[in-house]
């Protein structure tokens, strides 16, 4: 299966799709996921797009590398992205640290750190999310959760409110139809017998397993049939630590 970076997706709809939209899920209790970040991105070509992400430090958000753009604004403390609340914190990104080995053809190393211009204020609606150590290799079979503001169906519009779905970590063989899937770098997520999945639109959101962010929404099939591919965060812990320590 041909893999394409997000900007080329609309030109090659027969090939593949970005992951990120929540299909088969339910609306989250407002502000029950205080680490969630909504990213508004202005691309180098001019049009805007959106992604998900999550706060790992008061001044750093973790997301997918294919969510990079000319400029990014992060909204924290949101539930309904069309109704501004007192809980909102809108922060400018001053530096984008896309993984140096990110490959737009294979989507390997699809991970990026965003440094915020100002530190977020930690509140009941805004908080940080722990992420795994380098050697925390989460096994197949585990049930995890992913959240986002994307579409609730292939032909449906995006959701105004934060949605969440429970997904199973699959054996690597379940993602063998993805030509470049690499079990060391990525997670295979979602039971193919279910209609629950992440799909295009809110890539960059966290896969939460037992309270720890183990994955980042990366890509999946155009028809939204699971499983989808998530970046395996534990593999990148040394790189994350290096960026955080230097900034």
From Swiss-Prot:
UniProt-listed GO biological process terms: proteolysis
Job of this protein: Major secreted protease of mast cells with suspected roles in vasoactive peptide generation, extracellular matrix degradation, and regulation of gland secretion.
Pfam families named in the record: Trypsin (PF00089)
Catalytic reactions on record: Preferential cleavage: Phe-|-Xaa > Tyr-|-Xaa > Trp-|-Xaa > Leu-|-Xaa
InterPro entries, alphabetized: Peptidase_S1_PA, Peptidase_S1_PA_chymotrypsin, Peptidase_S1A, Trypsin_dom, TRYPSIN_HIS, TRYPSIN_SER
Keyword Disulfide bond attached: yes
EC class: hydrolase
Disulfide cross-links: 51-67, 144-209, 175-188
Residues that make up the propeptide removed upon maturation: 20-21
Tree of life domain: Eukaryota
Coiled-coil region list: none
PROSITE patterns in UniProt: TRYPSIN_DOM (PS50240), TRYPSIN_HIS (PS00134), TRYPSIN_SER (PS00135)
Signal sequence region: 1-19
Protein location: Secreted; Cytoplasmic granule
Active site, UniProt feature: 66, 110, 203
SMART domains: Tryp_SPc (SM00020)
Protein name: Chymase
Record-stated family: Belongs to the peptidase S1 family. Granzyme subfamily.
């Amino acid at each position: 299966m041909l893999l394409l970076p997000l900007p080329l997706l609309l030109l090659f709809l027969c090939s593949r799709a970005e992951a990120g939209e929540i299909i088969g899920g339910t609306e989250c209790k407002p502000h029950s996921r205080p680490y969630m970040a909504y990213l508004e991105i202005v691309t180098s070509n001019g049009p805007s797009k959106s992604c998900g992400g999550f706060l790992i430090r008061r001044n750093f958000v973790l997301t997918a590398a294919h969510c990079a753009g000319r400029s990014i604004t992060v909204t924290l403390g949101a539930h309904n992205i069309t109704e501004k609340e007192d809980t909102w914190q809108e922060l400018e990104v001053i530096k984008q640290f896309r993984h140096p080995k990110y490959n737009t053809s294979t989507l390997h190393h699809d991970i990026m750190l965003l440094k915020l211009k100002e530190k977020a204020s930690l509140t009941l609606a805004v908080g940080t999310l722990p992420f795994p150590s380098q050697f925390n290799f989460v096994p197949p079979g585990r049930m995890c959760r992913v959240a986002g503001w994307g579409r609730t169906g292939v032909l449906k519009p995006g959701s105004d409110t934060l949605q969440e779905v429970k997904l199973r970590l699959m054996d690597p063989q379940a993602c063998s139809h993805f030509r470049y899937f690499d079990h060391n770098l990525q997670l295979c997520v979602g039971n193919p017998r279910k209609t629950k999945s992440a799909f295009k639109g809110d890539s960059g959101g966290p896969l939460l397993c037992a309270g720890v962010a183990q994955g980042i929404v990366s890509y999946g099939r155009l028809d939204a049939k699971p499983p989808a591919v998530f970046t395996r965060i534990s593999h990148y812990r040394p790189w994350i630590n290096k960026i955080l320590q230097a900034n």
